[in-house]
């Protein structure tokens, strides 16, 4: 029997939104057996541009796209949705401190969390792309007390995909040869791209890529700073690759994970790996019959433990900052 899903996308007229919507409407996230309603949220000044995007979506005549709602009201956007993809966020501008960005986005995500809590379908799942995504997700989660905490996710799949791409290039193999590439912690420059547990053609990555200096001193910083490198080269932030990673994430959260692999997503820590209860932290995950679970038996060497501490400390600082602002 055909399935149907209602999906809210915030920041729908932005660059990531533009790269995301056409692929969503074509079935790339929810499958070719699932029809889609799109609820598109934008700020008032961007509504004319969003109407242009809607015209283009109509002009594609996607068989799976049933209905579209265009609005600047979060209550309308999140009404009865099964998925909320929180893409829109205030960008960091020159001279802006991270705490300023947290405050500006905090009010946005607090409001959206409340609107989701009051209006979304009972089975809603929330996936945050807008940065700083871990802490924006934390804010939304804390403002939606009626929704189970395990329904909130933040995107680190872009980091995972970046890491897989770099390992494949270095090893001279095709991308599908690289598996179990884990991103731990925050989607920021403190993230820990864990090559120690990655495999290449079924062997430990460290056996295939024997250049330890490259792994430690080139690979990790490249992944941690890839977003900034894209901005420097392109003059704009990652859009198509971010949209692609969001689609990959939704697919992985819904569909059973292959037995020999895992995927990375940030979710509510629930005390795992010594991470504070309630923080949104990226872990290796698997999906089985629609149930998402964290892989819990992974052990870290001293280097890995230090990297986990660095990213955890940053997430604690961000939490404390938004707590002080009264956002959670």
Swiss-Prot record:
The record places the active site at: 187 (proton acceptor)
Q: Does the keyword Oxidoreductase apply?
A: yes
Q: Which UniProt keywords apply?
A: NAD, Oxidoreductase, Tricarboxylic acid cycle
Per its record, the protein catalyses:
(S)-malate + NAD(+) = oxaloacetate + NADH + H(+)
One GO BP annotation of this record: tricarboxylic acid cycle
Which Pfam families does the annotation name? Ldh_1_C (PF02866), Ldh_1_N (PF00056)
Residues bound to substrate are 92, 98, 131, 162
Q: What does the entry list as the binding residues for NAD(+)? A: 11-17, 105, 112, 129-131
Q: Which InterPro entries match?
A: L-lactate/malate_DH (IPR001557), Lactate/malate_DH_C (IPR022383), Lactate/malate_DH_N (IPR001236), Lactate_DH/Glyco_Ohase_4_C (IPR015955), Malate_DH_AS (IPR001252), Malate_DH_type2 (IPR010945), NAD(P)-bd_dom_sf (IPR036291)
* Catalytic EC class: oxidoreductase
SUPFAM superfamilies in alphabetical order: LDH C-terminal domain-like, NAD(P)-binding Rossmann-fold domains
Q: What is its EC number?
A: 1.1.1.37
**Could you cite one Gene Ontology molecular function of this protein?**
L-malate dehydrogenase (NAD+) activity
Any transmembrane segments, and where?
none
UniProt record similarity statement? Belongs to the LDH/MDH superfamily. MDH type 2 family.
Q: Which NCBIfam families match?
A: MalateDH-SF1, PRK05442.1
Q: What does this protein do?
A: Catalyzes the reversible oxidation of malate to oxaloacetate.
Question: Which PANTHER family does the UniProt entry name for this protein?
Answer: MALATE DEHYDROGENASE (PTHR23382)
What protein name is recorded for this chain? Malate dehydrogenase
Give the species this sequence originates from: Coxiella burnetii (strain CbuG_Q212) (Coxiella burnetii (strain Q212))
Gene designation per UniProt: mdh
